Amino acid sequence: MNFLRGVMGGQSAGPQHTEAETIQKLCDRVASSTLLDDRRNAVRALKSLSKKYRLEVGIQAMEHLIHVLQTDRSDSEIIAYALDTLYNIISNDEEEEVEENSTRQSEDLGSQFTEIFIKQPENVTLLLSLLEEFDFHVRWPGVRLLTSLLKQLGPPVQQIILVSPMGVSKLMDLLADSREIIRNDGVLLLQALTRSNGAIQKIVAFENAFERLLDIITEEGNSDGGIVVEDCLILLQNLLKNNNSNQNFFKEGSYIQRMKAWFEVGDENPGWSAQKVTNLHLMLQLVRVLVSPTNPPGATSSCQKAMFQCGLLQQLCTILMATGIPADILTETINTVSEVIRGCQVNQDYFASVNAPSNPPRPAIVVLLMSMVNERQPFVLRCAVLYCFQCFLYKNEKGQGEIVATLLPSTIDATGNSVSAGQLLCGGLFSTDSLSNWCAAVALAHALQGNATQKEQLLRVQLATSIGNPPVSLLQQCTNILSQGSKIQTRVGLLMLLCTWLSNCPIAVTHFLHNSANVPFLTGQIAENLGEEEQLVQGLCALLLGISIYFNDNSLENYTKEKLKQLIEKRIGKENYIEKLGFISKHELYSRASQKPQPNFPSPEYMIFDHEFTKLVKELEGVITKAIYKSSEEDKKEEEVKKTLEQHDNIVTHYKNMIREQDLQLEELKQQVSTLKCQNEQLQTAVTQQASQIQQHKDQYNLLKVQLGKDNHHQGSHSDGAQVNGIQPEEISRLREEIEELRSHQVLLQSQLAEKDTVIENLRSSQVSGMSEQALATCSPRDAEQVAELKQELSALKSQLCSQSLEITRLQTENSELQQRAETLAKSVPVEGESELVTAAKTTDVEGRLSALLQETKELKNEIKALSEERTAIQKQLDSSNSTIAILQTEKDKLYLEVTDSKKEQDDLLVLLADQDQKILSLKSKLKDLGHPVEEEDESGDQEDDDDELDDGDRDQDI
């Protein structure tokens, strides 16, 4: 606090002692009073004094006010008074009408109090927590106070909010507040928060800020809205400008499409309010932020395409050609359209097709050029039209060809009813207005930029100077105007046009040198010692002469490279020439023009350099300097290298064209494949639908069939009793035949099983007898597992056969029972003479038994069917066992061969071991004879190892 008193010592005589004492007493009440009402009244009194006695209240009461915010959060009224008091202390808004000499002091005072407040970061965190309160009297003063802190000391407050947990998210909730004043002040708060802080900008953008802000703009009426729309647009600019991540997020979120509604300006609009002009101006600037030339090329291109696809470019062109548009809006619209079409072929083609609503219709380019060469139009508008024309021709060879074609004799309209772009450019080039000369020269230079074909085509242009005189070429007319000594702006424009025209075009250089007056004029301009105003012209003349040397193909004997360099050395001097050449890049307006493509000048006098021309100077200044100092031999070598490079470039171009054609073919084939895939998918879906329909029809058919069978069964139930004696014996006989077949098949299966058992036993015996103990030791566990599996399969087959035999026996018994029942039924048929009642009773009994027999017959049929299926399965298992036995036989043969080989190898090893032992014994005896001690333990150890190996082998044999 003493620091503030020292800094603001000039105000020490400020209030009377009674006021200072009052403030001190109020602070004491806030600090020491136990009653909430007393503290509340004291804070309210401090609030009323804080505007007039800002310094004293700030020095004495700030700590107490912060303490109130910490301890009295339950009382919204005292919190509101405390926040308002802090706002009055920190904010400079109330000092706007104060005299200028005290304004700076008040600003310093606000920043110093802000520094004291944020010295403890917990104070900002406390303020963020208060913003979560929904109470209007707490939330709104908190928003105002935090906004004031950000305005006073933005970066440190931003850093505190950034590291605070959910700090930015809490502030984003303000945009969803239903109370407009809080929402609107929340927008202002976010403006201050996002200024020059990329990290916070990203967080705010990913907190759905774009969606909320665009909704607010739509609710407020787009461009017809009030100052809230302006604030939202400024916040959107903060989020998007120089922030590639947010720009990509804005494009990917399809928010560009929502911008189209902003520019739907109807002709029925009675007038343009100042707020509407401001809003539309900011909207156009926001579009330019997305397509700025300083953005990454990929991001700019994608935004340009999105703007064309959603109709935003079309809407901007509608405003461009509309009537009654304010001049500043029209100028900004031209600049916006310029950057939307810059370098985008699709957008440039669309812009070329736009016509002005005139009779007859004229292309928009022609109408704009008419404004550019008209000296009565505003300077800013003419600059905007030039920028639009430059952007239309940027990387647009098609557009360049169309503009140059309007200058050629074959395309000029003989009737003179329509004015072409070429005629307007020529008219501006040779006008008496120096600004028109400069603009037309720069525009024509952009029609030639990087396009050697159009440079050659422009050499064909002939101009009729006066009646009776022969036509003069455009190139010659430009040099004639240069030699006449016109204004500096005109000469600079023509020299820039000639430098652009002659660079990278040896044919144009030859045409230029063919006029014998051009070289002496250039050398004379360079050699003279003129004032500072003419130094720029001298530098441009030096550049033009250097281009004539560097791109010279030596087709003219009098003006070869070597002769021109000798001429420079004689007339000018190499050092003097290089010094004059450096005048261009040292000019103060050169660096300004090289920064941005847009020709943005405060007045016509500053309109000297073009952005693209500065690039050309950077490219050629160094190579021209080297070319001046090169010898003829080095020039020859360089020409050979150039020819080789040209040949290489031609080959590369040829292959590029081939690759391009192949790419087109691939694209066509891919499209065909995609169409065929679509057709295939459609056919597959159709087939699936048809299959489902067929299945439905089948199900319906089966259902109808079952229903029909039930009906037939009910109809034939009355006649079944009469056919018992005829049908039942047939069924029984058929069952007997099936049982006999099952018996015979069972016998056959048992015989086959017996044969398989004998085969397996033979294999086992042969395997046991044929394999030695070593073979058994080397036999893989996999073979043993296969044998075990075969045994299990055989046992399973046997058990299945036993179960089948039991089933057959059961069926035989059931068959005999059926026969007995049939005989009893035959005996129980009624005899003549019995009473009708007895006959009816017996008939009923017979019908019941008959239905039971029929049911049992069906069950027998099902069982027989199951037995037949089991028989088939057993047959398959037998076949698989046969194949397994064959495989085992082959494996046994292989094992037998391996055992034989291993026996031979073991015999050989035994022989080798015996020889080795003999050698070892002889060596040991020799060592003993020589007197060396020999340990006998090794032999015993070896012998023990051998014994262990033999024991292990015996165990393996036992296994």
UniProtKB/Swiss-Prot annotation:
Location of region: Globular head: 1-637
Record has Electron transport as a keyword: no
Biased composition (Acidic residues): 935-959
Gene Ontology annotations for the cellular component aspect, listed alphabetically: cytosol; endoplasmic reticulum; ER to Golgi transport vesicle membrane; Golgi membrane; Golgi stack; perinuclear region of cytoplasm
Region (Disordered): 925-959
ARM repeat intervals: 20-60, 61-121, 123-163, 166-207, 208-253, 255-310, 311-354, 363-408, 420-459, 473-513, 518-571, 573-630
Annotated keywords: Acetylation, Coiled coil, Cytoplasm, ER-Golgi transport, Golgi apparatus, Membrane, Phosphoprotein, Protein transport, Repeat, Transport
Modified residues (Phosphoserine): S50, S940
Post-translational modification: Phosphorylated in a cell cycle-specific manner; phosphorylated in interphase but not in mitotic cells. Dephosphorylated protein associates with the Golgi membrane; phosphorylation promostes dissociation.
Coiled coil, from the record: 638-930
Database matches in Pfam families: Arm_vescicular (PF18770), Uso1_p115_C (PF04871), Uso1_p115_head (PF04869)
A biological process term (GO) from this entry: Golgi organization
Keyword Zinc attached: no
Cellular location(s): Cytoplasm, Cytosol; Golgi apparatus membrane
Primary location recorded for the protein, binned into one broad class: cytoplasm
Membrane protein topology class: Peripheral membrane protein
Function (record text): General vesicular transport factor required for intercisternal transport in the Golgi stack; it is required for transcytotic fusion and/or subsequent binding of the vesicles to the target membrane. May well act as a vesicular anchor by interacting with the target membrane and holding the vesicular and target membranes in proximity.
UniProt record similarity statement: Belongs to the VDP/USO1/EDE1 family.
Domain notes: Composed of a globular head, an elongated tail (coiled-coil) and a highly acidic C-terminal domain.
Protein known as: General vesicular transport factor p115
Organism: Rattus norvegicus
